[in-house]
Design a protein with these regions (language model features):
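Surface-exposed, active-site-proximal loop segments in enzymatic domains
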Residues: 87-102, 132-135, 198-203
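Catalytic pocket-lining loop regions of alpha/beta-barrel enzymes
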Residues: 4-8, 116, 142-298
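Active-site-proximal, glycine-rich beta->alpha crossover segments in alpha/beta enzymes
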Residues: 99-104, 119, 145-149
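Charged helix-capping and loop-helix junction motifs
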Residues: 100-108, 165-172
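Active-site gating loops and adjacent loop-to-helix segments of metal-dependent hydrolytic enzymes
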Residues: 11, 20-64, 95, 191-208, ...
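Short glycine-enriched loops at secondary-structure junctions
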Residues: 87, 131, 187-191, 303-305
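Alpha-helical scaffold segments that form or flank carboxylate-/histidine-based iron centers
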Residues: 15, 99, 129-132, 136, ...
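Mid-to-C-terminal alpha-helical segments outside catalytic/metal-binding sites
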Residues: 2-17, 24-81, 110-118, 139-143, ...
Length: 341
């Protein structure tokens, strides 16, 4: 399915790959099971801090549902297109029975499709699936790619208590490959009490979950079995791309542990994954470009809670070339999503 391309600039379309939405009914259904709607008093914050946090959450939640405000923000940021994804931090349903979870994900995807249809020049949808049940996930993936016209789906870092590389997940990955779907991997957040204080679930837990998810996909042979997969990892891939030397050392010294791999972990990182630019530190972005290549990175703001000037963040780099900046700002995302530019 073709998709219209809008350009604010005359040269390239600027595409934000990391932009969240919320469906209120699904959020209410998930309340109590997700990290973002857990009781803030459990974090040992002061009463003043709790009030400030509640105000911050309410403000950003409004931005996830008010599309007129979203479009205004996009124009101010210089963003032509947002890739809309359901916020798994707010409305994670993998804990539910598969049939119930499927209904919630269908509702989410229907609402997302309606939002995209209102302004298809500005929005592209990536749906959500009940990943804890691969047969149900495949069913909804096929609907997303067919009936709803999405470009792919967003998933969390685990399928509830099942790792992404688990043998039971192989049919799902086979379906993703068959349909040519793009998968955006964004953790739903660690709810373990150890990560509650100081919102460590976000600052420490999210990149840790991304590293674990990628490791599972690499070491369990998913990337080897389906090299054509298009998987983009949020937050610059978490910790893994920045610590690949240790992975490679273990691969060299303990080959008997890595029987489903034909190349080093760092090679999979460079050749089999994509990453968004949501790193909040230009030095880290430049390092990521050096290690995996500029052609593997897409711009991501983490709207509405992340980088307020995602275009400037990339443009301000002194080490990334202008052509590589153009690729990161939009051309790579267009290629990944199959858009004509």
């Amino acid at each position: 399915m073709s998709h219209p391309i809008r350009r604010i600039s005359k040269s390239i379309p600027v595409i934000d790959f990391h932009a969240h939405t919320v469906v209120q009914e699904v959020r209410e259904f998930s309340k109590g099971h997700v990290v973002q709607t857990s009781d803030p008093k459990n974090s040992s914050m002061s009463e003043e801090a709790i009030k400030s946090m509640e105000t911050w959450i309410a403000s950003n939640r409004r931005k996830m549902t008010d599309y007129s405000e979203r479009l205004k923000d996009m124009d101010e940021m210089g963003v032509d297109i947002q890739v809309l994804t359901p916020s798994l931090v707010h409305q994670y349903t993998y804990w539910a029975e598969p049939e119930i979870s499927l209904k919630m994900e269908q509702l989410t995807n229907n609402c997302l499709a309606e939002s995209v249809a209102v302004n298809p020049e500005r929005f592209i949808g990536l749906g959500s699936v009940p990943l804890q049940s691969p047969p149900h996930a495949i069913q909804e993936l096929e609907r997303c790619m067919g009936e709803l016209g999405f470009k792919g789906v967003e998933i969390s870092s685990t399928a509830e208590h099942m790792e992404l590389g688990d043998a039971k997940m192989k049919p799902f990955w086979a379906a993703v490959a068959r349909l040519g779907a793009t998968v955006y991997l964004h953790p739903s957040g660690i709810t373990d009490a150890r990560y509650v204080r100081h919102q460590l679930w976000n600052s420490v837990g999210q990149p840790l979950e991304e590293a674990m998810a990628m490791s599972s996909l690499i070491y369990e042979g998913v990337m080897e079995a389906f090299p054509q997969l298009k998987i983009c990892i949020a937050h610059g891939g978490g910790y893994l791309p920045f610590y690949a030397g240790r992975l490679d050392r273990n691969y060299r010294e303990k080959p008997f542990l890595h029987t489903q791999m034909t190349k080093s972990p760092s090679d999979y990182l460079k050749e089999n994954f994509w990453y968004d630019s949501c790193l909040y530190n230009v030095d880290m972005l430049e390092y990521l470009v050096e290690k995996v290549g500029s052609d593997r990175i897409v711009m991501g703001s983490d709207y509405p809670v992340g980088e307020s000037d995602p275009v400037g963040f990339i443009r301000d780099s002194q080490k990334i070339s202008d052509s590589d900046k153009d690729a990161i700002l939009g051309l790579n995302a267009a290629k990944l999503l199959g858009l004509s530019v």
